[in-house]
Amino acid sequence: MTIIKQEKTLFFFKNLQNIICNTFSKIDGKSLFKEDMWNTKKGYGRTRILKKGKVFEQVSVNFSHVFGKSLPKSSSNKKRDLENCSYQASGISVVSHPKNPYVPTSHLNIRFFLAKNKKRKTIWWFGGGFDLTPYYGFYQDVIHWHTIAKKICQPFGDDIYFKYKKWCDDYFFIKHRNESRGIGGLFFDDLCLPDFHSAFLFSKSIGKGYIDAYFPIVNLRKSYSWGSRERNFQLYRRGRYVEFNLLLDRGTLFGIQSNGRIESILSSMPPLVKWEYGWHPKPNSPESKLYTDFLPIKDWIDK
């Protein structure tokens, strides 16, 4: 049964990677993904990168299936019975860095773990989610994003959206900046109940939901005019993305702690970014509205 579970998830991840890459390429209309197939003693994967497109400056869509003899601390802190236990981890990770500052950055991750505890019993779970990081916020976009997120969760329970939204808000909060990375979405981990079929079905819904949630926003904003002011703000805000990924993100930490393939792990980084000492947006400016209207955690749709 364990082999069947693994085969089903691997097929899903690979197929979802194809669908998402085709959708990005179609919308961009200029650049195509370059594929890097890799294979090491610790696993294998398929890294796909789109660069210097018409709409997207860079997009990474990664599939991987890795193995290890000792589950890294980033995944075992809450699973004491799995410390120093062997594991397998497979999944897909997507990060888009648009060229146009009015198009938000997006992130999707779905992962499946198999591990054997100290009693040699096989333990499995799913994790993942998606979140949105705008530079210039639009209420229409945020409400659309969270409406899709709630729609995904509805068949699995009335409280699921609000549970995973809060988890996302908490997870993507940059403590050293005292601000959110973006406007959130969904985040879940350790999902193994009520059974494999239900947990897998929810994880598949996350993949489809990302497509339904993100690409309509891209199509709506990709033709907006922008200049150096918007570009500079975009590069500055990308700095927050880098800070979170390198300091706080469990996926990045897992890859580093497991001595994973660093090129693939860091492919989520934006190609260009900037920091400015002591910079603050002018009051009542379009840039300031990101901080006052969109980054504060709130319920975007009614309970």
UniProtKB/Swiss-Prot annotation:
InterPro entries: Coprogen_oxidase_aer, Coprogen_oxidase_aer_sf, Coprogen_oxidase_CS. Pathway: Porphyrin-containing compound metabolism; protoporphyrin-IX biosynthesis; protoporphyrinogen-IX from coproporphyrinogen-III (O2 route): step 1/1. Its EC number is 1.3.3.3. It is found in: Cytoplasm. Keywords: Cytoplasm, Heme biosynthesis, Metal-binding, Oxidoreductase, Porphyrin biosynthesis. The record marks H176 as: Important for dimerization. One of its GO terms (biological process) is protoporphyrinogen IX biosynthetic process. One of its GO terms (molecular function) is coproporphyrinogen oxidase activity. It comes from the Bacteria. The active site is at H107. Belongs to the aerobic coproporphyrinogen-III oxidase family. This is Oxygen-dependent coproporphyrinogen-III oxidase. The gene is hemF.
